[in-house]
Amino acid sequence: MSYVLTETSAGYALLKASDKKIYKSSSLIMDLDSSEKVLKEFKIAAFSKFNSAANALEEASAIIEGKVSPQLEKLLDEIKKEKKATLIVSETKLANAINKLGLNFNVVSDAVTLDIYRAVKEYLPDLLPGMSDSDLSKMSLGLAHSIGRHKLKFSADKVDVMIIQAIALLDDLDKEVNTYSMRCKEWYGWHFPELAKIVTDSVAYARLILTMGVRSKAAETDMSEILPEEIEERVKAAAEVSMGTEITDVDLINIRALADQIVEFAAYREQLSNYLSSRMKAIAPNLTQLVGELVGARLIAHAGSLISLAKSPASTIQILGAEKALFRALKTKHDTPKYGLLYHASLVGQASGRNKGKIARVLAAKAAVALRYDALAEDRDDSGDIGLEVRAKVENRLSQIEGRDLRTTPKVVREAKKVEMTEARAYNADADTAAAADSDDEDEETEEKADKKRKRDTEEEEEEEETESKKSKKEKKEKKEKKDKKEKKEKKEKKDKKEKKEKKEKKEKKSKK
């Protein structure tokens, strides 16, 4: 007998098929193309109803994960007594899990069974008595919403999303501030062109416009909160002899509005930077200590998550962010890049040009260690001591390569593990006689060892001489062969030239006759 296990939003349904080998039928689509044919073929054998929405969510999650719940196992116990029974299941994972239960029936889950499930799902309200199409659709919608909420709920794995979004927004803010600052300098530059050369900081430039307004008010404006005293004097002196044009009040209002936007963006950027720093110290403290907040956040954002970055090998971490250069190098068979996002780390920046690749490789290896501890350690210490330890090792390596002391990280002092004190054993005076008696034997053994070492050294020297002589003979032989080949080639070329010349002379003679 064949049974079809159907998972609905209302519960588990076990349908009994009239055809024992329906799953082997070649005309399955034609046999189940109408409601009458499906009702004639399948009859409900058992139904296990879900008690609540929470129960439905729990059972649906178990099916997605390929697990057999106690409720489903209880339902399957009803058909295990039948001999030569076949159970048709839609999910392969679930079929494997049912097989492991050791029930007395054959479990089938392949491409053919999908046609059966398509027909059953289409005419499901007709197969389940007391269930209308609208009831099932409402239950399905509620279960779908529950599964969606269950998948999107807050978890420890999703915390790194905050870092990914924060670093992306930080980059966008930098672009916006730079664009707005450039536009503001060009706009206000018509009125006071000398100011852009004196005040190079964009935020200070915008704050000065908000405070001062037109250049004629520069002399009476207090700029001490924005600029140092020397630069303030230069601004006031330049305002008196400026070559800029006059602007109207409407122009100034619009310029000030833009300057206000720049100041607000800069303040929010600083706040966002502090937030990112605190999140990085909480989620990846050791990586933060090693490469810094910004580089660490960019690595996590590029990999997609902290877990996927922690699973990456050191070689991948080293060139993360330089994928275009890597594939171009592989395509053109040139040297592959030595670093990607790690180039912006302070440790790589301290190295000279020829040593940057070496330090990037060392830093990537230590970053992999720090990442795995941050992402996978069970009892994690958020102090970042491991990050400081590996940073000190990278600095030591950098100092060795560069030939100068570049160490800035202090040594991490950890509490020593407690050692149990035990009583020392008493000195055995009787052992002195045995030691004295064995002294002659020890001298003989040392002499034998020295002789063996001398013999070994002489044998190694002889072997080296033999290999060198063999190499020289081989080189001479190769040179001789090359010389013979060259001579043969030259002889052949001379012979060919001679034959060509003779043929040419014969042709000329014939033409004269």
Swiss-Prot record:
Stored Pfam families: Nop, NOP5NT
Residues forming coiled coils: none
Region (Disordered): 424-513
SUPFAM superfamilies: Nop domain
InterPro entries: Nop56/Nop58, NOP58/56_N, Nop_C, Nop_dom, Nop_dom_sf, NOSIC
GO MF terms held by the record: snoRNA binding; snRNA binding
Example GO BP: snoRNA guided rRNA 2'-O-methylation
The UniProt record lists the keyword Hydrolase: no
Domain of life: Eukaryota
Primary subcellular site in the record, as a coarse category: nucleus
Subcellular location: Nucleus, Nucleolus
Residue ranges constituting the Nop domain according to the UniProt record: 283-403
Biased composition (Acidic residues): 438-448
Record Gene3D superfamilies: 1.10.287.4070, Nop domain
Entry keyword set: Nucleus, Ribonucleoprotein, Ribosome biogenesis, rRNA processing
Cellular component, GO annotation: box C/D methylation guide snoRNP complex; nucleolus; small-subunit processome
Basic residues bias spans: 471-513
Family under the similarity heading: Belongs to the NOP5/NOP56 family.
The protein's role, per its UniProt record: Required for pre-18S rRNA processing. May bind microtubules.
Name listed for the protein in its UniProt record: Nucleolar protein 58
